[in-house]
Amino acid sequence: MPRILIADDEESMRVLVARAIALDGHEIVTAEDGAEALEILTDQDGAFDLLLTDIKMPIMDGIALALAAARDFPDVTILLMTGFADQRERASGLNAIVHDVVTKPFSVADIRTAVADALASKARE
């Protein structure tokens, strides 16, 4: 069963995404911001198949989290989420480390498909 770490400062979004992804039988761990997510990744020695993170968050944003995760845990696939066009542009330079950027708002089906695609690409590596 794939392990997925979700980082989003909006509780309602964390809950929605966690519930949607759990429908596919994944083990879910959540974090309120990038710093907490990085702490979880470090404490668990990167034992996740996928990091699904919002870009715009306080303390440590998703871009900084993605850079740290890719550096320290290169086997973890990274999927970003954002509702802001300027944040999506910031992420465009991270193609080497980020699987994709999912644009908010999205449907439950959209996020499940994005996660399935990211996990499938990891399996092909």
Regions found by a protein language model. Name each.
Residues 57:
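Receiver (REC) domain active-site loop signature in two-component systems and cognate sites
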Residues 30-50:
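Acidic, metal-coordinating helix/loop segments flanking the phosphotransfer/catalytic sites
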